[in-house]
Curated annotation (Swiss-Prot):
Tissue-by-tissue expression: Expressed in spermatocytes (at protein level).
Upper lineage: Eukaryota, Metazoa, Ecdysozoa, Arthropoda, Hexapoda
Source organism of this protein record: Drosophila melanogaster
Domain of life: Eukaryota
Family membership: Belongs to the nucleoporin Nup84/Nup107 family.
Descriptive protein name: Nuclear pore complex protein Nup107
Gene Ontology biological process terms in this record: double-strand break repair via homologous recombination; eggshell formation; female gonad development; male meiosis cytokinesis; meiosis I cytokinesis; mRNA export from nucleus; positive regulation of protein localization to nucleus; post-transcriptional tethering of RNA polymerase II gene DNA at nuclear periphery
Length: 845
């Protein structure tokens, strides 16, 4: 067979050469030198690749699954079906697997990088297999079973008297449980991986069965095999069992290898390849045995065929029952190797022979159980519907019937620890519940994994579970939505750690509104720079999130967060701490949408109240700068007119203007105080004039004095103008219109959400600030007027404080009122010293 697909041996004739003996002895030392040089070069290359390899050892290659899964789900919005999405996700994972395999082949990262990539590959292959299982099972459950439901109701059951093939075809069409068993078997066979096991088969173009045994029988005196070694005397297939003698040792080894290769092909679902393998190695009787399981059908009995007067070939084995009984006996016998017994056990429903061989792998054991269960159900249906007398099967065969739940219970308590470990692993539990179609229990398991410790779950495990939940939700298999949301929320938290706004927004949008606000605001709290903030808001808008509520909660969380001071404590006066700077910059979140101007004012005012109470004037100024200068015009244009502004926004607007007036007054006072304390210094007088003083020095001194007098005049004018402006601005605070400074205007009713807004707490804060700031402003005003010589103005200040119109005296404590009256009394005393009465009027007799 020149086109044989199997590996060939370099042997000639009938005898196999010794393994690993192709190297001539005379070239051994030379070859060792070459090998040593090659190893040195390879180590050097590996070191270079270690240096150039990415530091995460393939992690970045695998992390592309996050955006790629997102892209696949986004494409779903363009009309892609749910099952097409699963196929696309599987294909994406395959692409990453191919890339990682390529990197391993190229030796990237050396041994350490290869080990880490291998662990990633192990996970990805299992994930791919699970996606394939999910697609196969639910495609049948959702689409095929729904389409066949009407047909099932019309039919009572399989038709009696049909051929074996017809009966089973009808059985598969009607029995969804059996069809699912077969789907799982097909999946297990498609996912079968031999792993590290190697089973080399030596072959050449013309193969003959048991050629070494034949050679020895034809050359009984051959010294190559020794004397007295008893082997079979005949070469028929039953000779070793009948004579109870072995084949030639090399043929025994080849026989075992062939049996193993055949079984592995059957385990992979490649029965036809197993037949070809038997024929290729000259063991046609094995091929005939493997044909015996096929269902019998004679198409010549069909009416539409008999009209053609042409005989068609008969399919299957008409004596299948006899073959099956013999296959059972072979599988149950101890005279054959375990692979031959297991091969017969696959087609005869003999579970014991399969468990003996496949005891160490969860998937292999599941495959063995399901093959047996399918065989029992198929055989039972055939014997119940076909009008034929069949050879009876042993009771052990029929007693092997189990449900899927019983199969998994047995796997959970398997003798082999590796089987038990996989059964209790996340992938094992996920695959088990997908097969059992117990989606509710699966989601409960996932929730327990997530709630136990999210940090122990890798982001890719969370990605995998979240997308399973999203698929189950889409096909209507999620019963408890809150449980499902916990899994998706855990994945969103993993994405928040990565900081990709589009992905975070998209998956957050699949949650309920409270969770959307909670999670996305948590993400926004971590974004500090302006451009990333804009991208985060844009992503939220595209995903359909409630941006107004999210940004409001974000700013509020940052504003109310209690953060300890650094090791240096509060910064110096006039400086802004990093904590305060973070709170102030958070107001940027409320600038993006014009509809949030009212919320911007509300949050800014709340910050200003806190900073004003803490005497952090510089923080107040910085907060004030975050509010657009034309905020009043924006609010009016937003609501159409001043009369349409809602109560909350109306109160916020007045409060904002109150702070604006306060800052203007305080800043003007600070400027006046600076000017007043920086009177131009008089130039230093020269020493007493002497005979040596010349005219030039005297002239220079006079010019300095004249310049000083001019500078003093300008200074006095500046101080006077600044004092006038300061008095006006400070009076603007005391005389603030519409019920006074930091007093809400009249509103017909409180806002609907006054309780959530802590409206009463705000009013208490404003009242407290009035009791702090109004006495302070009055003292500033008195100081400016007193130092400016306006003593009568100081006395008139008492009239404004005591006026019943504004009732400013109510914000004073006894101590503060006494302090103000004492300063006003000083002004009255100055008036008396100026020959005026205590109120500043001329004294009349």
């Amino acid at each position: 067979m020149a086109d044989s697909p199997f590996p060939r041996s370099s042997r000639s004739g009938l005898l196999r050469t010794t393994l690993n003996s192709s190297m001539p002895p005379q070239n051994l030392s030379h070859s060792l030198l070459i090998l040593e040089k090659s190893n040195a070069e390879q180590n050097e290359l590996s070191l270079m690749e270690d240096t150039g390899d990415d530091l995460d050892r393939g992690k970045s290659r695998m992390d592309v699954l996050f955006p790629q899964f997102f892209d696949v789900l986004q494409a779903q919005g363009n009309g892609q079906e749910a099952f097409e999405v699963i196929q696309s996700l599987t294909q994406v994972c395959r692409g990453v697997v191919e890339q990682l395999e390529l990197e391993i082949d190229h030796g990237m990262g050396g041994e350490q990088g290869a080990r880490q990539r291998e662990s990633m590959l192990t996970w990805l292959r299992q994930e791919i297999n699970t996606w394939r299982l999910l697609h196969a099972l639910f495609y049948d459950r959702i689409l095929l079973q729904t389409d066949r439901q009407a047909d099932d109701e019309m039919q009572d059951g399989p038709t009696l008297g049909g051929s074996e093939k017809e009966v089973i075809q009808q059985l598969y069409a009607l029995n969804a449980t059996l069809r699912e068993y077969q789907l799982v078997v097909d999946w297990l066979e498609a996912c079968y991986d031999r792993g590290e096991q190697q089973n080399p088969l030596h072959a050449h173009d013309r193969m003959m069965a048991w050629e070494n045994t034949l050679f020895q029988l034809e050359n009984l005196q051959g010294a190559a095999f020794g004397k007295g070694h008893k082997i079979v005397t005949r070469l028929d297939p039953d000779a070793p069992v009948r004579e109870k003698r072995p084949l030639h040792a090399l043929d025994e080894e080849d026989n075992l290898r062939l049996s193993r290769a055949i079984f592995e092909l059957i385990r992979a679902g490649r029965v036809d390849d197993g037949l070809k393998l038997c024929k290729h190695f000259g063991q046609t009787w094995r091929a005939a045995i493997l044909e015996g399981w096929r269902l019998h059908e004679d198409p010549n009995f069909e009416q539409n065929v008999s009209v053609l007067h042409e005989k068609l070939p008969i399919e299957g084995n008409p004596r299948r029952d006899i073959w099956k009984r013999c296959a059972w006996m072979l599988a149950d016998s101890k005279n054959y190797d375990e692979y031959s017994r297991a091969t017969a056990g696959v087609f005869s429903g003999h579970l014991g022979s399969l468990k003996t061989l496949l005891h160490s792998n969860w998937h292999d054991l599941l495959w063995a159980h399901l093959k047996v269960q399918i065989d029992i159900r198929v055989e039972s249906e055939i014997r119940g519907c076909c009008l034929k007398n069949y050879q009876p099967m042993p009771d052990d065969y029929w007693n092997g019937r189990m449900t899927m739940e019983q199969i998994f219970e047995e796997l959970n308590v398997a003798k082999d620890a590796s089987v038990r470990d996989f059964a209790q692993s996340q992938l094992g539990i996920i695959q088990r519940h997908l097969i059992l179609d117990t989606c509710g229990e699966l989601i409960q398991h996932m929730v327990r994994w997530v709630e136990k410790d999210t940090s122990q779950q890798s982001p890719h495990q969370l990605r995998f579970m979240a997308h399973i939940v999203l698929f189950l939700r889409q096909i209507g298999r999620v019963e408890q939505e809150r449980q499902a949301e916990k899994i998706v929320a855990a994945y969103v938290e993993a994405l928040i750690a990565r900081g990709e706004p589009q992905l975070i927004a998209y998956y957050t949008a699949s949650l309920s509104n409270p969770l959307q606000v909670q999670l996305y605001s948590r993400f926004l709290e971590q974004v500090e720079q302006k451009r990333p903030r804009e991208l985060a808001v844009d992503a939220a808008l595209q995903a359909g999130l409630d941006v107004e509520q999210i940004t409001r909660v974000t700013v509020q969380n940052i504003r109310l967060a209690h953060q300890p001071l650094g090791e240096f404590g509060e910064p110096q006066s006039g400086e802004i701490s990093a904590i305060d700077q973070r709170k102030i910059s958070a107001l940027e979140w409320l600038i993006h949408l014009p509809e949030q101007r009212g919320e911007l004012l509300w949050q800014a005012n709340a910050m200003i109240r806190t900073y004003l109470a803490s005497s952090k004037v510089e923080c107040m100024r910085q907060t004030f700068r975050m509010v657009p200068a034309d905020i009043v015009q924006q609010l009016v244009s937003l609501y159409g007119s001043v009369d349409n502004i809602p109560p909350r926004e109306e109160c916020c607007l007045k409060e904002y203007l109150c702070y604006k007036a306060y800052l203007s007054g305080v800043d003007s006072f600070v400027e006046w105080n600076r000017l007043q304390q920086n009177r131009p210094k008089k130039p230093q007088t020269s020493h007493a004039a002497s005979s040596q003083d010349n005219f030039t020095e005297r002239m220079a001194s006079e010019r300095k004095e004249q310049a000083h007098r001019s500078e003093v005049v300008r200074w006095e004018h500046k101080v006077k103008e600044q004092a006038k402006q300061t008095i006006e601005l400070l009076y603007n605070v005391l005389m603030f219109p519409d019920k006074g400074w930091l007093v809400d205007p009249f509103i017909a009713k409180l806002p609907e959400n006054a309780v959530q807004l802590s409206w009463d707490h705000r009013l208490l804060q404003m009242e407290k600030l009035r009791s702090i700031c109004i006495p302070e402003i009055a003292l500033f005003l008195n100081e400016v007027m007193f130092k400016s010589g306006d003593f009568a103005g100081c006395v008139r200040l008492a009239d404004e404080i005591s006026s019943e119109n504004r009732q400013l005296y109510k914000v004073y404590t006894k101590h503060k009122l006494a302090e103000l009256l004492a300063k006003i009394a000083d002004a009255s005393l100055e008036l008396l010293n100026s020959k005026l009465d205590p109120w500043g009027y001329p004294i009349t007799t």
